[in-house]
Every structure is written in structure tokens, then in C-alpha cells.
Design a protein with these regions (language model features):
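Extreme N-terminal starter segment of soluble prokaryotic enzymes
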Residues: 1-2
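Feature recognizes metal-dependent phosphohydrolase scaffolds
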Residues: 5-7
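Short acidic-hydrophobic, aromatic-tinged amphipathic segments that line or gate anion-handling sites
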Residues: 139-143
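Conserved small/polar residues in nucleotide/adenosyl-binding loops
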Residues: 162-164
Length: 164
């Protein structure tokens, strides 16, 4: 069994971990990097794995630094389920389309300003359509229900009163 830290290792944003066994590949969170321009640029890099090879995503909560790259993941080939609690799923249904609007607005503003100064145009990280399509992957899992993926890989969402 291998656990790879893909984000939130040298920074507090971009939470994402890849759990791999011979039988399964699970992504734990798929968060957006936030902060300086250099940190945010990490969102535009290719994933360090093939999204089509991921069997499922376990989403711990709906903060954008934990779920913000799920639309990009799905657009880039992920076909599996995103496991999340009801509350997390409901919040992600608000957060991800809102994030897409922000991505589109930021790109439009950058490109309008950049046209005058000669900057290279940028594209939004993902679109509203990408965010909406990603939400179709969500599968609600009740708190305290064990998800069994293989004989050796199981997960349970516990209720946290400290952090959403």
C-alpha cells in the first residue's frame, strides 16, 4: 500500500492524497491551490497521475482547497464516484459552480486587462459545465457507514464538530 501526498505538503492548500494498492487507486480530496500567483499556477499543471486510472475519490469536506479540482479531474478523464456525506455533497453543489464562475470571471478580467498590456490570454481552470458534470459523480455516503473497497481498504466518514 502506498500513500502519495500530492498537495498540502509544502503549503496548506491543494489537499490531495493518492492511496494505491495492487487492487485500487483512491484519491482522498482533490483540492485547489490557493494563495500567491505561483501557488495558484499549480492548479493548471497536469495531474501527477492519469485521472482515468482513479477508481474513486473520498471527499473529506467541501472547502475549495479540498474539492476545487474535482471538475478538472472529471474533465480530464475521471469516470468513478466521488464519495461524500450528504452535507459535503450539498455544499460542493454550491461551491463548485461558484468556483467555476470565479474562474471564468478572473480569466475574462485578466484577458481584458492583458489585451492592453500584451499579456498572454488565459483560459478558466474549468467551466460551469465542467463543475455541473462533476457533481454527477457524487455519491452520498451516510456518516459512520463503512465503505469497503477491497479486503484491506475501507473508509468511514466520521462527524466532525471542529471542521466542516
Amino acid at each position: 500500500m502506498k500513500l502519495r501526498f500530492l498537495g498540502a505538503a509544502h503549503t496548506v492548500t491543494g489537499s490531495s492524497y493518492l492511496l494505491e494498492t495492487k487492487e485500487i487507486k483512491l484519491l482522498i480530496d482533490c483540492g485547489m491551490f490557493q494563495g500567491s500567483k505561483r501557488i495558484r499556477s499549480l492548479n493548471y499543471e497536469d495531474f501527477l497521475f492519469n485521472p482515468a486510472d482513479i477508481d474513486g475519490v473520498l471527499l473529506t469536506h467541501a472547502h475549495i482547497d479540498h474539492c476545487g479540482l474535482i471538475p478538472k479531474l472529471c474533465r480530464d478523464g475521471f469516470k468513478g464516484p466521488v464519495y461524500a456525506t450528504k452535507v459535503t455533497s450539498e455544499l460542493a453543489a454550491i461551491m463548485l459552480p461558484d468556483s467555476a464562475h470565479i474562474q471564468e470571471s478572473d480569466a475574462e478580467l485578466h484577458n481584458r486587462k492583458g489585451k492592453r498590456s500584451g499579456d498572454v490570454p488565459i483560459k478558466p481552470l474549468y467551466s460551469l459545465d465542467d463543475a455541473t458534470a462533476a457533481l454527477e459523480h457524487f455519491k452520498v455516503v451516510p456518516y459512520e457507514k463503512e465503505l469497503s473497497f477491497t479486503d484491506n481498504v475501507r473508509a468511514v466518514f466520521h462527524l466532525s464538530l471542529i471542521h466542516i
